[in-house]
Amino acid sequence: MPIIEQVGAREILDSRGNPTVEVEIALTDGTFARAAVPSGASTGEHEAVELRDGGERYGGKGVQKAVQAVLDEIGPAVIGLNADDQRLVDQALVDLDGTPDKSRLGGNAILGVSLAVAKAAADSAELPLFRYLGGPNAHILPVPMMNILNGGAHADTAVDIQEFMVAPIGAPSFAEALRWGAEVYHSLKSVLKKEGLSTGLGDEGGFAPDVAGTTAALDLIGRAIESAGFKLGTDVALALDAAATEFYSDGTGYKFEGSTRTAEQMAEFYAGLLGAYPLVSIEDPLSEDDWDGWAALTASIGDRVQLVGDDVFVTNPERLEEGIEKGVANALLVKVNQIGTLTETLDAVALAHHSGYRTMMSHRSGETEDTTIADLAVAVGSGQIKTGAPARSERVAKYNQLLRIEEALGDAARYAGDLAFPRFALETR
């Protein structure tokens, strides 16, 4: 029985140069593991709270308080617990914090311990993390949803939509999907250069040109796909993350592309995009608290496209359950740091799948070299993963881990491909 013997923590830097928490766990059998916690740029109001230091150091973003929470309170509370009883460990963390949003000890402190314990237990069992968490049937490799053009909070431009993604749905394997996405990414750089547009990068490795708006960005990506030798909609489809909470003003509406719009007008805009482009997925098309607008949008176009709830659900089983009851969205974005423990994340995924919702595993804009979400995507069979462009090592680390997993699975590996998007009708391709 692997027992937690030592717990350590330190402050490290994420991909945006901001501090984050890294936790190390040692077990009585000599097993050692570490986990690093990501951080978001566009965050939902209902997420688990990150504990930051305030003050002048690192512009107030230091995490020494969270590190001390691990060393002084969390560590002593979990030392002696059985590492392979993840639910027991995570419940101890939740109980110790005692707040609904993990604001006392910090979601960043709690998550670091939760993930490090899981990784240590997997190593102790001599199993890869995806197999330890997913069991013997974990074999589905996800479609990489590559954010190759950045806007919104991820780029300093006038583009309101936060992420423009390509999805290599027609590839025969994950390795080929990764190649296709990388080739489209490089093709887009050439297209942007020809148009005299910037090829500077946003937070997640995608290009951040200051283009006229949504359709202009989609047209550029369409050209890049075809210039790379692929068929738009058959080989490679498109997806969006609007992050609409970022341009929503309570009581006023959605300040989008030069005008203020209602939820109904935004729905009309998205419906128009579906008629013009092969879109398989739209994330956060409306604000996190616009439940009525979400329900109406889902009823209107939810049978034609995947509508992913990120800020509206924040990987929280309780909010997801409410959304399911109200007919909000048809897919869940999964971010482990939104809820703060691995167990709660797995519970949210299980609820989504049981209710007919798809799931998309996701990184954050402030990432590290930690590859846990790659294993988690295969473990839960999400069929989709969003972890940035095929650039910047903190993004590529996840893709490279998925290559290793596919290789390890051998003939048992199956790439999700277009089966990950059943609402994307054949006649639209």
Swiss-Prot record:
What residues bind (2R)-2-phosphoglycerate, as annotated?
162, 335, 364-365, 386
Q: Which InterPro entries match?
A: Enolase, Enolase-like_C_sf, Enolase-like_N, Enolase_C, Enolase_CS, Enolase_N
What is its pathway?
Carbohydrate degradation; glycolysis; pyruvate from D-glyceraldehyde 3-phosphate: step 4/5
Going by the record, the broad EC class of this enzyme is lyase
Predominant location? cytoplasm
Localization: Cytoplasm; Secreted; Cell surface
Keywords of the record: Cytoplasm, Glycolysis, Lyase, Magnesium, Metal-binding, Secreted
- Recorded GO MF terms: magnesium ion binding; phosphopyruvate hydratase activity
For activity, the cofactor(s) needed are: Mg(2+)
Q: Which GO terms describe its cellular component?
A: cell surface; extracellular region; phosphopyruvate hydratase complex
Read off the Pfam families from this record. Answer: Enolase_C, Enolase_N
**Entry's EC annotation:** 4.2.1.11
Q: Name one GO biological process term.
A: glycolytic process
Q: Key word tRNA-binding present in the record?
A: no
Q: State if Transport is listed as a keyword.
A: no
Catalytic activity field: (2R)-2-phosphoglycerate = phosphoenolpyruvate + H2O
Q: How many cofactor units bind, and how?
A: Binds a second Mg(2+) ion via substrate during catalysis.
Q: Mark the transmembrane ranges.
A: none
Which Gene3D superfamilies did the record assign? Enolase-like C-terminal domain (3.20.20.120), Enolase-like, N-terminal domain (3.30.390.10)
Provide the binding site for Mg(2+). 241, 283, 310
Q: Where is the active site?
A: 204 (proton donor), 335 (proton acceptor)
Which function does this protein serve? Answer: Catalyzes the reversible conversion of 2-phosphoglycerate (2-PG) into phosphoenolpyruvate (PEP). It is essential for the degradation of carbohydrates via glycolysis.
PANTHER family reported in the protein's UniProt record:
ENOLASE (PTHR11902:SF1)
Q: Give the family this protein belongs to, as stated in its UniProt record.
A: Belongs to the enolase family.
Q: What is this protein called?
A: Enolase
Gene name as annotated: eno
